[in-house]
Amino acid sequence: MKILLAACNAKYIHSNLAVFNLKAYAKEYDSQVVLREYTINQLKDDILKDIYRCHPDVVCVSCYIWNITFVRELMQDLRKILPDVPFWAGGPEVSYDAETFLGKNPAFNGVMVGEGEETFLELVKHYVDGSVTLEETRGLVYRKADGALQNNGWRQLMDLSKVPFAYENLEDFENRIIYYESSRGCPFSCSYCLSSIDKKLRFRDINLVKKELQFFLDHKVPQVKFVDRTFNCKHDHAMAIWQYIKDHDNGITNFHFEISADLIRENELELMSTMRPGLIQLEIGV
């Protein structure tokens, strides 16, 4: 049994943290889960050829606003050469209206909605050893044998500290940006943004975060981009991380954060003023 996790990134230097998290969470089935990353700038035929050569028994693909059109067209073509292989979609672009997505995209068998780690693990168990049924797996919307759609509902949000560290092997990320997550969710309710739908904001244990940041520092990773929606929404969390990377600066690694300017406090500005130029980058929406 071979389950393929496929990601179509915007550029080669990007990496897809989500699929690496899924593979890490299903570590007990590591030999059955294969990961492939592509870009939306590649020829579709080259991607189709690579996927076909993998001989997958199941294909799972990650969907975002920047790749959804490309992915839909790709999977429609892939269905012609892999007519009997189950195709699953996941990610924010398909989670919130999964039934409509499946209605418009007959190439797909189902959608993993919401957070994928636990759902993907159960999906792997279903296909590998049959220990879990689709019917009992929360977080799935899928086509039944008669073509009707089955919606199992969303599963409860998980403890972010239980997500395994995805970067034990850095060889796959040479000359690429490392993405890191210390929180999930967003405190705001912007009507144009999918992030606002998930109202529960959760943080990874700060001691675990420091341990993982030290791993990047020890390996002199050029850049680490935090994917936290609003990094400085919890001041003690942000200050603890900024203080740690200042105190353990290796002179090489740069850290990138998305923050809200109106939440910045004086003590945060004072700390930033003592940092090495280039140690941090701040991305601020206006």
Regions found by a protein language model. Name each.
Residues L5, V61, A89, V113, ...:
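Conserved beta-strand positions
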Residues Y12, W66, Y96, F101, ...:
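Tryptophan-centric aromatic hotspots in well-structured domains and transmembrane helices
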Residues Y12-A18:
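Short N-terminal binding/cap micro-motifs at the start of the first secondary-structure element
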Residues V19-K23, I51, R72-Q76, V124, ...:
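Generic structural signal for well-ordered alpha-helices
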Residues S161-V286:
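Radical SAM [4Fe-4S] cluster-binding motif and immediate context
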